[in-house]
């Protein structure tokens, strides 16, 4: 029995399903999860000593690669002065100033510890600011596991939930909790216009992943985001970009810089923690003024602005501002997507791939999907076979056909060539 299997068997005795986040259980693809012991650069090693080229990157944060020496040093130096204070620090101010500088739509920002906290707090703030209740979200978009957002959501819910019903995607969420959440089709401008016409003056906020990454990778169209911006402005609704995944990942200023659309509020996470638990929400100064202790919208967190996370995040934000960083990252990610598509064509496998900045999507279907419905037309059985074949050849992809992948600055041409070699063998087996 492998060491990975031994650990999985042991974990299931004390941890529900043996994991602390459902997608890690390999339920979607089958088989035994890999228990990771260490990581460096573009590589991870499991409990059996197997090395993998990593295309998960902790689901996005590891944009400069694992265990970057400067990030490690910053965390070590900070840890020498204690792990947490429960009081303000100067580093928090520096982090806030850096975020506001790099994302101009954010005039003020509040640090939290997870993406779920960021989106949950942003929606509460939008409702408090507008005095309205109704929220619009989109099919397949995942905004964390807050109750009101678990309706036709993406990520692990595409494996575990019934996505055909316009009802809570998770047990334990009363229908009453989600009755103020309207779910529309991603990239459907007409449906969005109809919703605003029918519910004029009632909509508190529209929340969207401008590049969806939790139903695999799906780009928003320019027309979709532009219509969203115009409708929110006209109706007085708050436009929230959930950039927990795309922030500092698809461009230095996030997806909003990529598209040239200015939201009212933005949620950030992943990259801003450099691999440590950190997230943030921010936006217009007048909206943020409604937040306690200034206003009546309450939000708090014992570990918000944690010194270790801020140290890792600030160092990562410094590294990604190096000249040409995003040009190189986008070029390598596009090269990966194109190379995998070419390998699939050579093997006669129906397949398409897409890339935005440092994110990519792999689809076992003809054509790149533009909606949740199109994503679900992918051949998941074929993906599962491909996933395991790649794993056997030392390439670690997301263990689900409904998750985006991530490239780091450490994925050089040699790493991509090794990936293509593995893919040619894997497509033959798929």
Curated annotation (Swiss-Prot):
It is an enzyme of class 5 (isomerase). Its main location: cytoplasm. NCBIfam families: hemL, PRK00062.1. GO terms for cellular component: cytoplasm. This is Glutamate-1-semialdehyde 2,1-aminomutase. Residues 1-21 are annotated as: Disordered. Belongs to the class-III pyridoxal-phosphate-dependent aminotransferase family. HemL subfamily. Signal peptide: none annotated. Keywords: Cytoplasm, Isomerase, Porphyrin biosynthesis, Pyridoxal phosphate. It catalyses: (S)-4-amino-5-oxopentanoate = 5-aminolevulinate. Homodimer. The keyword Cytoplasm applies. Its EC number is 5.4.3.8. Its cofactor is pyridoxal 5'-phosphate. GO terms for molecular function: glutamate-1-semialdehyde 2,1-aminomutase activity; pyridoxal phosphate binding; transaminase activity. The modification N6-(pyridoxal phosphate)lysine is found at residue 270. It is found in: Cytoplasm. Residues 1-15 have a biased composition (Polar residues). InterPro entries: 4pyrrol_synth_GluAld_NH2Trfase, Aminotrans_3, Aminotrans_3_PPA_site, PyrdxlP-dep_Trfase, PyrdxlP-dep_Trfase_major, PyrdxlP-dep_Trfase_small. GO terms for biological process: protoporphyrinogen IX biosynthetic process. It holds the Pfam family Aminotran_3. Pathway: Porphyrin-containing compound metabolism; protoporphyrin-IX biosynthesis; 5-aminolevulinate from L-glutamyl-tRNA(Glu): step 2/2. It comes from the Bacteria.
